[in-house]
Amino acid sequence: MQQMRDLLERLLAAGLPVTPEISDAMLAVDIQHFTDHDLIPFLHDRPVVFLETPAGGVKTISAPHMVVTLLHHLELQPGQEVLLLGAKGGYIAALISHIVGPGGRVTVVDPSREVVEHVRQRLKE
């Protein structure tokens, strides 16, 4: 948790729009739940792998600065319904769900069967 706080402070110091809502969501949703890979890259503002496909493809969760920028520009409000195209391991959907709250809804669409199965499994846990 402290590592995420430190990351958010660095992003804010760099001028990124880390709002209280975004900060709360990123502190509440544990990214480790969405990947079995090392989090060191993510904590250093790099993408982190969440899935390697049988064909050799690598799927990643976006770097934190991209996640913060996306969430900021979505202008999310409690109770909103959100359609997310591209699952990114389920992490961004979980962040959005945290921000829109129990009165909101998040629907995720992804063209990759492997990604969809990964997200289903991770969101069940």
Predicted regions and their residues:
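Class I SAM-dependent transferase core
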Residues: M1-I99, E114-R122
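Conserved SAM-binding strand-loop segment of SAM-dependent methyltransferases
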Residues: E125
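Conserved SAM-binding motif I beta-strand of class I
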Residues: R105-D110
